[in-house]
Amino acid sequence: MERSDLPAVADLFTRTFRKNNQATDSQLAGYLETVFFSSPLYTPDVGSLVHLNETSTIDSAILAMPVEFIVHGRPVTARVLCAFMAEGKSGAAGAARLARMLRAARQDFCFTDNASPVSADHWVAGGGLVLPVQSLEWHRTFRPAAAVLDMARRRVKLLAKLPLQGLARIADRFVRRSRTSFAAAPHDGVTSAPISLPQLMEQAQVMMERFSVHPVFSKPEFDWLVAAAKLNTALGELQCRSIADAQGKVIGCYLYFGADGRNAVVMNVFCHERQEALVVAQIFADLDNLGYASAQGMAQPFLTQAVLRQRHLVHKHTGYFCLVTRHADLKEAAIGDGFYAGGLASESWSRLLHDF
């Protein structure tokens, strides 16, 4: 894909995923350029792909952005696939050609965390994997009335103009008084504090060493990912905190989006081995104490047992986490416990998921 293709790709995206829109959002092409062309890692070899039909019209496309990973000590630039779209019969044929280009035998590393069932089948047919745990999101409720109101406001914009927040607060006081399990409790002696983004990265780099496959998050790339993620203002403010045990030793840190009194979206959780239960309990206690109605995040195998200890928590499936690679050691790590991806190292922060 070239920059000159962006207006046509924006129109194709709108016709494919936003069929109720009468016209393409005027900001969409610019956003596509920011996300898919401005990364410090961008090269055409790891960029997006388009297919032209016999009239030289774009009838199918795969949007992709690069994220650098460490795979058993060696750097590998992954393609994060963010949207797969096609239109008409020629588009279906073009999509099949694009999909063949991304078969496992040809790729160092490609993945998505938001594939549809049909797309997931294509990934598997192309030699790829579906990771079942990472295909789930956990959702924890702290204030049920406020959580229901927040969800309703996202679906019915008119509700955002009505003064219903006060009623939700009154209802939640009563509910939390009668059902104390809605409150999240930390472990004794564990504390947390806000930290800067550079501090988060300094701590996370050490904690990611437990995984044989994990993002590099070099300073140029991390700064770019943060700047791109912050464009999604609907998620709230991007914040991070560090967690320490009773002796004051840092055992974990996390990055999240939060909007006052609404939903918190946990992007990334990092921790030392065997500290998962303490870290996860503190995260939920923090978000509860900060007044959020609810919280959500991508399920991760290394955190699953700790997350499942929470009350008023459910797992939801919104899209499949799929990957393809020609490297056997990467595939082995993904199947086992040596793989870390998601959050900033995914498309979960993208405005394309719910905006435009």
At which residue positions do the language-model features occur?
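Residues that line or immediately flank small-molecule/substrate-binding pockets and catalytic motifs
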Residues: 65-66, 83, 88, 114, ...
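Amide-forming acyltransferase catalytic core, primarily the GNAT-like/NAT-type
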Residues: 7-71, 76, 129-261
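Acidic/polar helix N-cap motif
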Residues: 2-5
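A short, internal acetyl-CoA/4′-phosphopantetheine-binding micro-motif in the GNAT/acyltransferase core
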Residues: 82-92, 268-276
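Glycine-rich acyl-CoA binding loop
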Residues: 89-102, 276-280, 284
